[in-house]
Design a protein with these regions (language model features):
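Major-groove recognition helix of helix-turn-helix-like DNA-binding domains
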Residues: 48-66
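Conserved catalytic cores of phosphodiester-cleaving nucleases, focusing on short active-site segments
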Residues: 142, 146, 167-171, 180-188
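Acidic-basic catalytic patches of nuclease active cores, encompassing PD-(D/E)XK
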Residues: 122-156
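Short, charged amphipathic recognition helices of the HTH superfamily
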Residues: 26-45
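Beta-rich nucleic-acid/ligand-interaction surfaces
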Residues: 156-172
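Catalytic cores of nucleic-acid endonucleases
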Residues: 184-234
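Short, Lys/Arg-enriched anionic-surface-contact patches
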Residues: 3-27
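Interdomain/boundary linker segments immediately adjacent to catalytic/signaling cores
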Residues: 75-132
Length: 254
């Protein structure tokens, strides 16, 4: 079955994630690299621009249909639009269903599996969750609450994550005026390590008080955030780390 994620509306994606988590339970969590349902609800919910509780509710809705330990919403019939999704996708095997869920976030399961060694499979599973936490999920979290933050009150928001400019968001009060740059990082736990790329470090040095490091922590339980203005001159202590990378290519003459 060819599954193209672009044809799904957001609500249908949420329903499908709920169905996946209900059907495959903890095996499904492991296949996506999550350690708990709470972590999966938080990470996927925010990444989709929705509430974590929405995914939990859809999982609970499907629970009476599967032999897991949860009772779910067993006292009411399945809603019509959920039943429609269930009937269409209930037969998906674990690999296909996990690949579909990953495709919602731009992860091409089939392309990667062609070159992936078996011993890398476990690492690949954990990398999916890690990349969501450190990337899209943290960015969507920031977008969902930035208008409530006093530091950015009255500023318009521009998403620059695809521009490669050394920060994730640009905020301005007036068109053409000075802007604030916000680099967003995400952590699974309450504490952890994070790094700045050379470009991010360069921009933080140049912009000083106009550069903000926004760190979302504890996605495994209950996310919260910390904001660091001019992070290179505050209480954070950065240590330079140099890594030698070997690039290999194959050349020919025609």
């Amino acid at each position: 079955m060819a599954l193209i994620s672009q044809r799904f509306a957001t609500r249908e994606k949420l329903i499908l994630v709920g169905l996946y988590l209900s059907k495959y339970d903890r095996l499904g969590l492991q296949r996506l690299g999550f350690g708990s349902f709470t972590e999966a609800f938080n990470v996927i919910g925010y990444a989709m621009g929705s509430r974590p509780a929405s995914i939990k509710n859809y999982r609970d809705e499907f629970d009476p249909l599967f032999p897991n330990r949860r009772k779910g919403w067993h006292k009411r019939p399945l809603r019509r639009y959920c039943l429609k999704v269930f009937e269409e996708y209930k037969s998906l095997d674990l690999e296909s269903f996990a690949g579909l869920v990953k495709s919602f976030f731009g992860y091409d399961e089939n392309a990667w599996s062609e070159v992936q060694e078996k011993e890398d499979e476990e690492e690949s599973e954990s990398q999916f969750a890690k990349r969501l936490i450190t990337g899209l999920t943290a960015e969507q979290y920031f977008q969902s609450i930035h208008h409530n933050l006093s530091e950015f009150e009255g500023y318009s928001l521009e998403n620059t994550t695809r521009l490669g400019c050394g920060y994730d968001f640009r905020l301005r009060k007036n068109p053409g005026g000075d802007f604030l740059a916000v680099e967003v990082k995400g952590l699974k736990e309450r504490t952890g390590n994070l790094s700045l790329t050379p470009k991010e470090h360069q921009l933080a040095t140049a912009l000083r008080d106009r550069f903000f490091l926004f760190v979302v922590k504890n996605f495994q339980e209950s996310p919260f955030h910390e904001i660091f203005s001019n992070p290179l001159s505050g209480r954070l202590q950065f240590k330079k780390r140099e890594t030698l990378t070997v690039h290999i290519s194959w050349l020919t003459r025609v």
